[in-house]
Amino acid sequence: MDWNELEKIRLAKVEAMRSEDIEPYPTRSEVDQTIKTAIIAFEDFEKQSEPSINAPQAILAGRIRSKRVMGKLAFCHIEDSSGRLQLMLRVNEIGQGGLKEFDERFDLGDFIQAGGSLMRSRTGEITLLVSEYKMLAKAITPLPAAKDEIVDGKVVHHATLSDPETRYRQRYADLAVNDEARNIFRTRTAIIRALQRFLDKHDFIEVETPILQPIYGGAAARPFSTFHNQLHQELFLRISFELYLKRLLVGGFDRVYEIGRDFRNEGVSFKHNPEFTQLEFYMAYADYEKIMGLTEQMLATVCDEVLGKRTFIFDGQEINMDIPWRRVELRQGILEATGVDIYAYPDAEALYQAMQKAGLNPKEGQPRGKLIDSLIGDFLEPNCIQPTFLYDYPRDISPLAKNKPGNPQIVERFEGFVGGMELCNAFTELNDPLEQEKRFAEMGRTYDADDEENHPMDEDYLQAMSFGMPPSGGFGMGIDRLTMLLTGNRSIREVILFPYLRDIESEE
């Protein structure tokens, strides 16, 4: 590695410590509790009517986040994943040599172990009065930037990082210095756990299905492909869990769900990442109406558990997740927004001409399904700020959904929108193997062989359906987008620990 001048200074400290047989990266620590636990123990000690003579003792560890040395006294703040605490180092306890060593060898970003007794400083801050300490890990590279803060009349230097590109590329540094970033991912974890609790409570079982698949399906997207050398077989990273989860319905599991990664070889945007986390569940003997109700309950419960309320601010607007959500029939919604009645134009060319006449600037040469998708994305989705279900979709764009009784051109499908973006997608599942085979064939004829919307024929899935699949409802939702909403972030990169980024060399 090429080291800059500041890093060379820290490397010299590493060499100096080792020359004195002091290991800057020891194998073990003697930590006996977290910072949060120590603070709680001290607060309990203070509440005692007749406190014991000796204050609580603790051996703590953390990253040094601030540091100041003043004559025979030094202060620093350390931080672990549970909280932050001030350390006080005095000549009385550690000697002049100990204070000198701390001053000269410890820098912001270093991990320190400190033992001593808990107390309150003159300003009332809970503090560990250090009687012994040691280096746990020397940080050679300084934390990315610095800001100053006045504490007790003294200037304290704190590490921070704000440049978005650097934060995404060096997420480890971002997490090390930004509380806000860590809180986003704590919230993300809380969201996933709340979803699991809700589904478990409703008798769903969590399962795992293949990530490497011989045939991709369950969504309209271009897959990533790979090759198994020993089997001489092309494989695909899954774009959806759907077809495998529905095989489990055939096998007798009436309520199943999976939370995991999907991979789609498509564009990157503020709300799209090629690798993303998805929740899908399937429920036997349910239809899309029942799934709508379950969706409302589930997301209201998640808000209650994660936020403690059902309202939050997203993109400057207050969103209210109370039940029930607004419901808009898709045909009527498009008609009111654009003046185009999509069911009056049963083929792509007729719909294209109608959109042209209405001044909607459609893209030429698109299948009818893609034209309808563009109407939804351009004219309905941005206006669905409060939770909204768009329902009853054309069969053209829903090859796995069941027809609405009495209308073979419409399927029982809904999409949920919140904050002006799609959050979830669900439908009454098609369980007729003959109709499903016909739909797969139609998709193959409608789109070119290399089109991303082309849905390959999955013979094994059809075989599974032929054994009998119960009537059911299915649901899919992006965990990343839900996290965006509940943390108030407009960019998906903010809620994925290591988002996809273009190589720096290719940018140059």
Per-range role (PLM):
Residues 1-508:
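Class II aminoacyl-tRNA synthetase catalytic cores and aaRS-like
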